[in-house]
C-alpha cells in the first residue's frame, strides 16, 4: 500500500481484515488490540480519522466504528496481487485434486469449479473453452432423413458437437462414410478453426484441382463446421454459500444476487472481459465498470467483487472466477484462483492449441 505511510497501512490493513472476519464496523480499541502498534488511543483515533478523510474509511453511524470503502479494498487487493504474482507453483494438493481423475474436459472443469467453491466458501464459475480451438478427434456423417445429414464431431478432451446440415444431393450411407474417412485422414488433430480455414481455401481454388469425391467431402465438412458456433459451457457452483454471507441476510438482497447468477449471458460477458488479463484480476461492482459494461452488469452484483483468472496459457481457453461480497477473504481466494488456473493450464494445454 505504497500510497500510505507504514502506520496508516498497518492500521488500514488491520481494519480491513477485521471487517472481513466480522462484517461489523471496527472500533479503535479493536484496531489497537489487533494491530500490535504502540499507539495511544488518541493517536489511533487520529490515524483512523485521517484515513476517513482520505476516503479509505467511512463511519456508518456516529457511535459506530469504521468500515473500509471500495477504495480501501482496491488498495488492499492490489498489494496482495503484487505478493501473489511472485508465486509460480500451484500448491501440491491442488495439483493432486485435479490431476489424473477427469479425462473429459467438462468433468474436469466441473471438478475445478466445485473445488474452488468449497475452499473459497463463495460462488465459483468456470467458463469452458469454445470448440473453435479444440482439436478434431473424428467427424462422422450419418443420414438423418430426407435431405438432412447429422454431423457428429468428437473433439480432443471428450467434447462432442452434433449438427444437422442440408444434403441436397441425397448422399448414401457409404458415401457419407467415405467423406468422414477422408476428412479424418487429412484433418485429425487439427483445430476446428484451422480446418475451417483450410477447407475454405481448398474449395475456393487455393489448392490443387480436387477430385469430385474430395470436393463433396470438403463441402459437407464446411457446412458442418460453419454451423458450429462458439457456444461455451459455464459451470457454476456454491450458490448456497450466499446464505452464509451477512450482506445477503435480507431476503430481497439475496434474491437480487440469485437472479443475477441466473443471467447466464451476462455472466459470460463479465468473464469474457477478463480473459485477456495476464493473471489474477479483481473487479469491484459497480466501481470498476462503466459505460456499456456497467449497463450490462446485473444489478444484483452491486456491492460484490469478482476474482478471476484466465487459463490456457498465451492463448487463453477460458476463465475461472469467484463472486462474493466485497468483504471477501482475498488472502485465501487470490492464491486459490491463481493455483487452479495454473493447474487447468497444465492439464488442458495438450488438448487445445495453446501456447
Swiss-Prot record:
GO MF assignments: DNA binding
Alphabetized Gene3D superfamilies for the sequence: 3.30.450.40, Winged helix-like DNA-binding domain superfamily/Winged helix DNA-binding domain (1.10.10.10)
Functional description taken from the UniProt entry: Negative regulator of class I heat shock genes (grpE-dnaK-dnaJ and groELS operons). Prevents heat-shock induction of these operons.
GO biological process: negative regulation of DNA-templated transcription
NCBIfam families for this protein: hrcA
Gene responsible for this protein: hrcA
Keyword Transcription regulation carried by entry: yes
Originating species: Nitratidesulfovibrio vulgaris (strain DP4)
Keywords: Repressor, Stress response, Transcription, Transcription regulation
InterPro entries assigned: GAF-like_dom_sf (IPR029016), HrcA (IPR002571), HrcA_C (IPR021153), WH-like_DNA-bd_sf (IPR036388), WH_DNA-bd_sf (IPR036390)
Transmembrane segment boundaries: none
Keyword DNA damage included in the entry's annotation: no
Superkingdom, taxonomy of origin: Bacteria
Coiled-coil residue windows: none
Record-given protein name: Heat-inducible transcription repressor HrcA
A Pfam family that the UniProt record links to this protein: HrcA
Family under the similarity heading: Belongs to the HrcA family.
Amino acid at each position: 500500500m505504497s500510497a500510505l505511510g507504514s502506520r496508516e497501512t498497518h492500521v488500514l490493513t488491520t481494519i480491513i481484515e477485521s471487517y472481513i472476519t466480522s462484517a461489523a464496523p471496527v472500533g479503535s480499541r479493536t484496531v489497537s488490540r489487533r494491530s500490535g502498534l504502540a499507539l495511544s488511543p488518541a493517536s489511533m483515533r487520529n490515524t483512523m480519522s485521517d484515513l476517513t478523510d482520505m476516503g479509505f474509511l467511512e463511519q456508518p453511524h456516529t457511535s459506530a466504528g469504521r468500515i473500509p470503502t471500495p477504495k480501501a479494498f482496491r488498495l488492499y487487493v492490489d498489494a496482495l496481487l503484487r505478493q501473489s504474482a511472485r508465486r509460480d507453483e500451484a500448491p501440491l494438493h491442488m495439483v493432486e485434486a485435479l490431476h489424473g481423475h477427469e479425462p473429459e474436459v467438462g468433468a474436469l472443469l466441473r471438478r475445478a469449479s466445485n473445488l474452488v467453491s468449497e475452499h473459497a466458501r463463495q460462488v465459483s464459475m468456470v467458463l469452458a473453452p469454445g470448440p473453435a480451438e479444440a482439436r478434431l478427434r473424428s467427424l462422422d456423417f450419418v443420414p438423418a432423413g430426407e435431405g438432412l445429414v447429422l454431423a457428429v464431431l468428437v473433439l480432443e478432451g471428450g467434447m462432442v458437437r452434433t449438427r444437422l446440415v442440408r444434403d441436397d444431393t441425397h448422399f448414401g450411407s457409404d458415401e457419407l462414410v467415405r467423406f468422414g474417412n477422408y476428412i479424418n485422414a487429412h484433418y485429425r488433430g487439427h483445430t476446428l478453426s484451422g480446418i475451417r480455414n483450410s477447407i475454405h481455401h481448398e474449395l475456393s481454388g487455393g489448392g490443387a484441382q480436387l477430385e469430385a469425391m474430395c470436393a463433396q467431402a470438403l463441402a459437407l465438412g464446411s457446412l458442418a463446421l460453419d454451423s458450429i458456433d462458439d457456444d461455451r459451457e459455464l459451470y457454476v457452483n456454491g450458490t448456497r454459500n450466499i446464505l452464509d454471507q451477512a450482506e445477503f441476510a435480507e431476503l430481497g438482497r439475496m434474491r437480487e444476487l440469485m437472479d443475477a447468477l441466473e443471467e447466464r449471458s451476462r455472466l459470460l460477458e463479465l468473464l469474457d472481459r477478463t480473459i485477456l488479463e495476464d493473471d489474477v484480476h479483481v473487479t469491484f461492482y459497480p466501481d470498476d465498470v462503466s459505460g456499456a459494461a456497467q449497463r450490462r452488469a446485473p444489478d444484483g452484483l452491486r456491492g460484490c467483487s469478482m476474482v478471476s483468472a484466465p487459463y490456457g496459457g498465451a492463448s487463453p481457453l477460458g476463465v475461472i472466477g469467484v463472486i462474493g461480497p466485497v468483504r471477501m477473504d482475498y488472502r485465501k481466494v487470490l492464491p486459490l484462483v491463481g493455483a487452479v488456473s495454473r493447474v487447468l493450464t497444465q492439464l488442458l494445454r495438450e488438448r487445445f492449441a495453446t501456447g
